[in-house]
Amino acid sequence: MDKPHIQIMSIWLIVSTLLLLLMIVVGGITRLTNAGLSIVEWNPVSGIIPPISSEDWNNEFNKYTASPEFNLINNQITISEFKYIFFIEYIHRLLGRITGIIIIIPFLIFYYLKSLTKLQCYRLLLITCLVIIQGFMGWYMVKSGLKDTPYINHCRLAGHLLLAVVIYHQLIAELLIIIQPFKCYMLATSKANNSNSTSINVINLKTKLIVLNKIIIFLLYTQIMFGALVAGLDAGLIYNEFPNMGDSLIPIEILNQSIDFTMFDNQVLMQFIHRWFGILISCLIICYAIWLIILNKQALRGMGMVAACLVLVQVTTGIITLVYHVPILAALTHQVGAILILTTFLFIQNIVTNFELLH
């Protein structure tokens, strides 16, 4: 691929990644403001145009009044209040459409112009398919709160968020494959140091770094899933103290074995797991970050410091979110923090894959 195509594709992937990150943020706002069930229909094309006239708004409001959320929770809501939550959900859906178009259309153009390698076609086709599935997944999630209960199914919410994170992950990975920022830097450093050989010890160290980094990425995905389950269950609104849950570190519901441990729909259990699994991952990340810093290789040392700082901020925002009964700003910062930590480890993965170039 020539340099102009690399630059164009890089800009496209950066814009797509930033849009997806914004989508995750707006999705968090939608959840925290309880606006997700304000639009009770899914019209991918005609839904682009919002209500304009008073008649349009009355029609939308009448549709909403037939929903479980209105009948069981918001039956005193005014049309002005309805407009507020409607526009939050509308912006979320509109941004989803824009993000989908920005990802899919350029891919089709690149494919038509034969600017992609075979492997790139497969990877970008996968991303395109995931984006389309995500649109259906969003409606599948919303639909769960429009029938009998005025609540979105928390497992579907977790699936919706995880799919967004997977797409984000794939976009970052594709961007790093194309521009190879760390590899270029390390090649230059390697040539300057006249390094002509790679020892067995270096290869073994590289393998350990790659394996542990992949384990951390998997654990981060798992923790993000638990965070989504906590959000979907409103489990952050119980036991709002730290480190105890009630009178002890382990809540009485668990001590009394009154929880069905095969289920993911118990508020107490989900909050307990999200708390302490998060602490466990944070300790692991800090240890790994210290290791990267001790290795004293410039690219790794910097990323190790970034990872350590981010995880300390993440623990702090998590505790603030819990203790202060889920304030929107703290909760959003906590959600974005998880994505930034994941991004950091995707960058670290790119570095350690070319670790021998540092020697």
Curated annotation (Swiss-Prot):
Binding site for heme: 274, 334
Keywords: Cell membrane, Heme biosynthesis, Iron, Membrane, Metal-binding, Oxidoreductase, Transmembrane, Transmembrane helix
Disulphide-bridged cysteine pairs: none
A cellular component annotation (GO) from this entry: plasma membrane
Main location (coarse class): membrane
Localization terms from the record: Cell membrane
Enzyme class name: oxidoreductase
Cofactors: heme b
Function, as annotated: Catalyzes the conversion of heme O to heme A by two successive hydroxylations of the methyl group at C8. The first hydroxylation forms heme I, the second hydroxylation results in an unstable dihydroxymethyl group, which spontaneously dehydrates, resulting in the formyl group of heme A.
Assembly mode: Interacts with CtaB.
HAMAP family hit by this protein: HemeA_synth_type2
Family, per entry: Belongs to the COX15/CtaA family. Type 2 subfamily.
Name the record gives this protein: Heme A synthase
Organism from which the protein derives: Orientia tsutsugamushi (strain Ikeda) (Rickettsia tsutsugamushi)
Recorded name of the encoding gene: ctaA
